[in-house]
Amino acid sequence: MVGVLTNRSAPPATVTPVLAYPDVRAAVEWLAAAFGFEERVRIGESHRAQLRVGSDGAVVVAEGSSAPTTAPELTKLRVPDVDEAFARAVNAGATVVSELQTWEYGERSGVVADLAGHRWELTQTIRDTAPEDWGGTTVGPW
């Protein structure tokens, strides 16, 4: 975002989800094994951690209840090979919420739940498709 200062103590992403886990260290290890996240900053042994993935993805793992919020949360994680990433997550112990599916809008995705019940949509772009080609409407640029 133009005009926003960066800080070496905070993730540079414009939007950073903060997810609560009962065991921060176990969550960090699991997210690394299942999704390839890398720990960037650790705040205490069990209080909080900042993780990165890819060139611009970030998530904060915070100490807290294992129960996800009552609102339906979903964190979307874009990957280069969704079939491999989905299998990796399941092999690490993720629960399948919805199997992989190829969508008319050019994405292939599936949803898994992690060790604390947070849902992750793993997605891969398989082709560039105009929103108008599948019933959407372009209303502004990215």
Predicted regions and their residues:
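Hydrophobic alpha-helical segments typical of transmembrane helices
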Residues: 60-61, 85
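Short, charged/polar, Gly/Pro-enriched secondary-structure boundary elements
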Residues: 56-60, 69, 117-119
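Core segments of cupin and vicinal oxygen chelate
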Residues: 7-12, 18-58
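Vicinal oxygen chelate
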Residues: 1-10, 14-22, 48-54, 66-142
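Acetyl-CoA-dependent GNAT
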Residues: 61-66, 124-126
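A short beta-turn/loop motif at secondary-structure boundaries
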Residues: 43-45, 67, 103-104
